[in-house]
């Protein structure tokens, strides 16, 4: 992938965002006597599990108490988890991932209860701060890489089942923007709809069906906003011997990295997010805010992504320990 340099990572001026820098616990105000509620959508996948564990560890390291819930990827449970946290009157609530439409009313209740809301990879009008990767950079860089890798001409099979999830919405939007400058690159319609449970097998079946509909030369790449469906996609493509098709994802899931490291696999590239840093940064922002240092807490804390392809996968895995 065409990795941007650290000085080239843009932060939208209107967002109030900053590129987040990690601080030691000694530099962050104590959370002693404070209780922080944590509501995660799930801990099914590596990304959400690491963030969930890390934010709890950091709150406790800063002296705070944690009330942690995870919704097992069930939207209704995620809503009820947030509502149950409100009833326990914590000093702050951190929500990890979620669907904007489904969670909106519950987050409005958090706001009405006067409880500061913090989010991770989930934008909300009620959030004091959202910690996230720079999804505009992720989306545009992956899109440009695909377009260049297929020679500026061809057809892309797309998984687009999570339009209500902020990172996916942004990454897909950037794909559309980039392709405006590649008029010979088309998105295959109708787009595929990825699922959150049974993702790999479902995606594998959908791509198998697509391979039957579109013979060799009619699919050049497969795009998704995350890695899990792409593992199934790559399995289907590799089993069919369709080595003309390249697969691209986001999240640097271990299974995806293993496939990228395999020169025979169609899985071509992914993007690592700084999951440990995201959890730590969110807890630090809570501590700063509750201490009264509100001016030190931006609307959005952006963490720089790391782009991984077949050329650098081993090096990046060693450097990041993934």
What are the residue ranges of the model-derived segments?
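A residue-level marker of the well-folded mature domains of exported/periplasmic proteins
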Residues: 1-322
């Amino acid at each position: 992938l065409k990795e941007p340099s650290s000085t080239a990572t843009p932060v939208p001026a209107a967002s109030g965002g900053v590129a987040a820098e990690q601080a030691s616990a000694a530099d962050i105000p104590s959370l002693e006597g404070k209780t922080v509620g944590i509501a995660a959508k799930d801990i099914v996948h590596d990304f959400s599990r690491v963030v969930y564990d890390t934010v709890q560890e950091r709150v406790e390291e800063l002296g705070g108490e944690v009330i942690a819930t995870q919704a097992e990827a069930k939207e209704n449970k995620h809503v009820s988890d947030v509502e149950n946290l409100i009833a326990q009157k914590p000093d702050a609530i951190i929500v990890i991932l979620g669907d904007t439409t489904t969670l909106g009313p519950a987050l409005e209740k958090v706001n009405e209860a006067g409880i500061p809301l913090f989010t991770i990879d989930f934008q909300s009008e009620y959030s004091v701060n959202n910690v996230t990767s720079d999804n505009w950079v992720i989306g545009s860089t992956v899109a440009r890489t695909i377009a260049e890798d297929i020679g500026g001409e061809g057809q892309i099979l797309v998984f687009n089942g999570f339009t209500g999830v902020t990172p996916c919405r942004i990454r897909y939007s950037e794909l559309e923007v980039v392709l405006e400058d590649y008029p010979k690159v088309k998105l295959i319609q109708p787009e595929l709809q990825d699922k959150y449970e049974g993702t790999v097998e479902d995606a594998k079946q959908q791509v198998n069906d697509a391979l039957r509909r579109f013979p060799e030369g009619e699919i050049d790449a497969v795009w998704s906003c995350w890695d899990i469906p792409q593992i199934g996609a790559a399995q289907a493509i590799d089993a069919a011997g369709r080595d003309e098709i390249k697969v691209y994802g986001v999240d640097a899931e271990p299974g995806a990295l293993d496939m990228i490291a395999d020169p025979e696999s169609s899985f071509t590239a992914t993007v690592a997010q700084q999951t440990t840093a995201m959890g730590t940064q969110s807890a630090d922002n809570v501590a700063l805010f509750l201490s009264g240092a509100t001016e030190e807490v931006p609307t959005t804390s952006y963490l720089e992504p790391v782009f991984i392809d077949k050329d650098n996968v081993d090096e990046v895995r060693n450097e990041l320990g993934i």
